Amino acid sequence: MASMAATASSTTVVKATPFLGQTKNANPLRDVVAMGSARFTMSNDLWYGPDRVKYLGPFSAQTPSYLNGEFPGDYGWDTAGLSADPEAFAKNRALEVIHGRWAMLGALGCIFPEVLEKWVKVDFKEPVWFKAGSQIFSDGGLDYLGNPNLVHAQSILAVLGFQVVLMGLVEGFRINGLPGVGEGNDLYPGGQYFDPLGLADDPTTFAELKVKEIKNGRLAMFSMFGFFVQAIVTGKGPLENLLDHLDNPVANNAWVYATKFVPGA
């Protein structure tokens, strides 16, 4: 555990210690801990380079040569050799980052309407994510946030058209850049349009944020898969499933549903 500095700044006494079978500094948190701001900055040595954390800890001595810790989220695991080819590696890395971002947005969108309706009393008519779309065929149609004074979503073609145009513009800017802004970057375009707060201005912070993004993106993709399975098995939203489980864990859990679930029944 990182030790707290007694003053606003201090220096770390560095010594080699075993960390998951690898030689690491005694404190993996860089000692830039300020008492006033209580800010901890992770050492990027923990996530990048040959001495980074591996997926099996001390049993990860033999990792593929092409997984050298250059990119965020590289724990040395590719048993199927899917990324042995450099072009395939670049493609898979881009797919993972983009799908992770979509999954983070999707997971929030699946939960947030249920939260707003239950505790903020916002009337969505149907807050459950996989049932909401069907409301477009109801008598009252479907309105954004359940408010008829906002954009009316009754026309599926109009919504689809706007979605294609808006997403096409954003993706085009992301890949090709903007006039006068630069050539762009497929995964991390940055700049005033994609990073207006300047969160990635510092290279060390930027490298750390990439790791946080890919880790949370992977977790969100698993979460979305869980939401899909819950929807098929229970017919309920994620928040309702969680509350049911907390209310009666014995009667509401995966094992109970696994014993009585029959696909298509």
Curated annotation (Swiss-Prot):
Does the keyword field hold Membrane?
yes
Membrane protein topology class: Multi-pass membrane protein
Where in or outside the cell? Plastid, Chloroplast thylakoid membrane
Task: Please list the residues that bind chlorophyll a 5.
Answer: K212, Q230
GO process annotations (BP) = photosynthesis, light harvesting in photosystem I; response to light stimulus
Binding of chlorophyll a 6 occurs at H245, A254
Q: Where is the transit peptide?
A: 1-42
Q: Which residues bind chlorophyll a 3?
A: Q135, L145, E213
Report the co-factor binding details. Answer: Binds at least 14 chlorophylls (8 Chl-a and 6 Chl-b) and carotenoids such as lutein and neoxanthin.
Q: Give the top-rank taxon of the lineage listed in the UniProt record for this protein.
A: Eukaryota
Query: What's the name of its gene?
Result: CAB13
- What does this chain do? The light-harvesting complex (LHC) functions as a light receptor, it captures and delivers excitation energy to photosystems with which it is closely associated.
Name-wise, this protein is Chlorophyll a-b binding protein 13, chloroplastic
